[in-house]
Amino acid sequence: NLDKILICPKIYLNSFQPAGEWPKAPELNEYYKIAKKIFSNSEIVSGMVTNFTELNRKRPKMFYDLVSFSFTPIVHDSSDFGVLNTPETIPYILKTLKNFSNSTKVHIGPISIGMHFNPYGESLVSNKNKIRLEMADSDPRHDQLFSLTWTLAIFIQSINKESKFFTFNSIYGHHGILNKDNTKRPLYHLNNFLISLTNSEIFKFNPVNEVYGLKIVLNDKKYYLFVNSSKQKKEIIIPELNISCLLYTSDAADESDR
């Protein structure tokens, strides 16, 4: 049996403007009802496969077991600065979602720098030259520590009472944690680390602007994890331990390759 199944009509892989013409299709709840009859032992995940913008425009009347949306930072701005600023939007997105979904549990994913779907055009932009590019099917920073920095910042910003599941990457391909030859990308280690946090207590701890942190309590031991999403070194203080730390930046490629 399937544990969970995400229901999203194919037509809604496209974007529709609030004041524009919408497709003549059954209400989303009709799809959910049918899915629940067929997959009676599975949790039904409502929402969109695309970004939160599309979910906000097409809000289901009922949300069932979970509500889902994906997240990518390169819709409008693919620069390092633009991408590293997107984690700031997550708390506002989740607050809005909580208000109109009656605090339904949340799944966020897929989460990646490169896009999985382009609801605003016929297809994704091919990025064979591996440059910074809006609406691209892949992104060169996925192979760098930059992707680890950004993904961890998204995870930390997403932690709240409603957020229950995250889908970060695939195994192989443009968004994979492994290369074709099975060598490990930086995100492989992040995924393994997050899996290791099962049964731990996690607390958000953001000591200064552009630094996101976690305090982790596991087996009566405390761990601190910080990510610097700025382009400068940052000094932070952990009052509980009475120590200061200097956080360096990721190894993002130079902007000249854009």
Cite the ranges covered by each PLM segment.
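Noncatalytic carbohydrate-binding groove/subsite architecture in carbohydrate-active enzymes
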Residues: 18-143
